[in-house]
């Protein structure tokens, strides 16, 4: 306000809202979102209905994320608005307060794993400053290679896989035969698998869930030294958020499926020969990553039910501090159902005893 000559005041010009950076409290708000998504999907484990489980997780995450203090825009979600009524790309999420953020979510990474009761299904999300995440819309797949912090400086996606394996083994003080490479089990990877086997390295084939595989490659004592191969671009960006927090490295190149997708990418200005680094995929200093296990896996334990409640295990990371937290939580479903808008019981007639 400014003073007039008669001592009265009049409003001054409006001031712009200062950009607000995501703070550390956001991490705990976000992990509640993936916990809820995992608990909702946990009721569908092994039931052979991946759409039902994914839908339950989507509904729950959307309900919870709109209580989080942020002004988020979905950069990676369930698809375009016409095909995804919730968590579609471009949707605004959060409660309207707090920092402006890019929001990436995969309610269930590994829907087939969940539906079959197989290991390594997780509920996962990432948050970064607005404009920090690479736009994945032009090309659905990318070729990627991932390693942990100790080998980040020797990674070269343009080199043969054998050279990468030998370089990583050298800096990790391993023999090539000690190395384990994680690869999605797909027909397109037949040559890659042959090339890795020719080096003498071991292979860990996974049917789905390459976000968890990429994180395992960055974690000591995980038993995985590298992830390689073609996988989803959205999953690559979400994995890059985790890798930013862990100090590892991912390199990627867009991999169009056909001439139509290639032309679409070129028309949109993408350089298909460009090597995308971790920072190209997710830039900025404020990157958050959260994941909660749905089924037991190498990265996280799945949702486990007991009389009166369930337990979840989550991993929460923040790039600014470099902190990685493992969170074990016990949820009293009998208490949650007293106030939550979400039905975590999966049975309207259930009467859980108190634990």
UniProtKB/Swiss-Prot annotation:
Binding positions (Mn(2+) 2): 106, 109, 235
EC numbers, comma separated: 3.1.3.11
Chain sites annotated for binding substrate? 109-111, 141, 186-188, 208-210, 232
Q: In which pathway does it act?
A: Carbohydrate biosynthesis; gluconeogenesis
The protein's superkingdom reads Bacteria
* GO cellular component terms given for this protein: cytosol
Q: Please list the GO terms describing molecular function.
A: fructose 1,6-bisphosphate 1-phosphatase activity; metal ion binding
Q: Which InterPro entries match?
A: FBPase_class-2/SBPase
Can you tell me which residues bind Mn(2+) 1? Answer: 54, 78
Q: What is its main location?
A: cytoplasm
- Example GO biological process: fructose 1,6-bisphosphate metabolic process
Q: Where is the region Disordered? A: 1-25
Query: Which reactions does this protein catalyse?
Result: beta-D-fructose 1,6-bisphosphate + H2O = beta-D-fructose 6-phosphate + phosphate
Cited Pfam families: FBPase_glpX
Keywords of the record, alphabetical order, are: Carbohydrate metabolism, Cytoplasm, Hydrolase, Manganese, Metal-binding
**What is its cofactor?**
Mn(2+)
Which family does the record claim for this protein? Belongs to the FBPase class 2 family.
Q: Which PANTHER family match?
A: FRUCTOSE-1,6-BISPHOSPHATASE 1 CLASS 2-RELATED (PTHR30447:SF0), FRUCTOSE-1,6-BISPHOSPHATASE CLASS 2 (PTHR30447)
- What this chain does, per the record? Catalyzes the hydrolysis of fructose 1,6-bisphosphate to fructose 6-phosphate.
What's the protein called, per UniProt? Fructose-1,6-bisphosphatase class 2
């Amino acid at each position: 306000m400014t003073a007039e000559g008669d001592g009265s005041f009049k409003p001054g010009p409006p001031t712009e809202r200062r950009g607000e950076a995501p703070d550390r409290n956001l991490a705990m708000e976000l992990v509640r979102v993936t916990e809820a998504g995992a608990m909702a999907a946990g009721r569908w484990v092994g039931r052979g209905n991946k759409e039902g489980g994914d839908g339950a997780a989507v509904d729950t995450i959307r309900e919870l994320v709109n209580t989080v203090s942020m002004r988020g825009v979905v950069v990676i979600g369930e698809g375009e608005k016409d095909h995804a009524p919730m968590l579609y790309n471009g949707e605004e999420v959060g409660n309207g307060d707090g920092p402006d953020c890019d929001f990436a979510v995969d309610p269930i990474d590994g829907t087939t794993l969940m539906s079959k009761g197989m290991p390594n299904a997780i509920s996962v999300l990432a948050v970064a400053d607005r404009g920090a995440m690479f736009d994945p819309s032009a090309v659905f797949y990318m070729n990627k290679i991932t390693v942990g912090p100790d080998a980040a400086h020797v990674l070269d996606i343009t080199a043969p896989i054998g050279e990468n394996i030998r370089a990583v083994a050298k800096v990790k003080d391993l023999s090539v035969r000690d190395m384990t490479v994680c690869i999605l089990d797909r027909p397109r990877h037949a040559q890659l698998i042959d090339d890795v086997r020719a080096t003498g390295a071991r292979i860990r084939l996974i049917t789905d869930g390459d976000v968890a595989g990429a994180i395992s490659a960055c974690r000591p004592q995980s038993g995985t030294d590298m992830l390689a191969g073609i996988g989803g671009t959205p999953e690559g960006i979400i994995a890059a958020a985790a890798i930013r927090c862990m100090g590892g490295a991912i390199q990627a190149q867009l991999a169009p499926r056909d001439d139509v997708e290639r032309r679409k990418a070129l028309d949109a200005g993408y350089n298909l020969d460009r090597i995308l680094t971790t920072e190209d995929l997710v830039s900025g200093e404020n990157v958050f990553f959260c994941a909660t296990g749905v089924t037991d896996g190498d990265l996280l334990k799945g949702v486990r039910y007991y009389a009166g409640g369930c337990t979840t295990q989550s991993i929460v990371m923040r790039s600014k501090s470099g902190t990685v937290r493992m969170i074990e939580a016990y949820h009293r479903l009998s208490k949650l159902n007293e106030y939550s808008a979400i039905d975590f019981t999966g049975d309207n007639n259930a009467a859980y005893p108190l634990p």
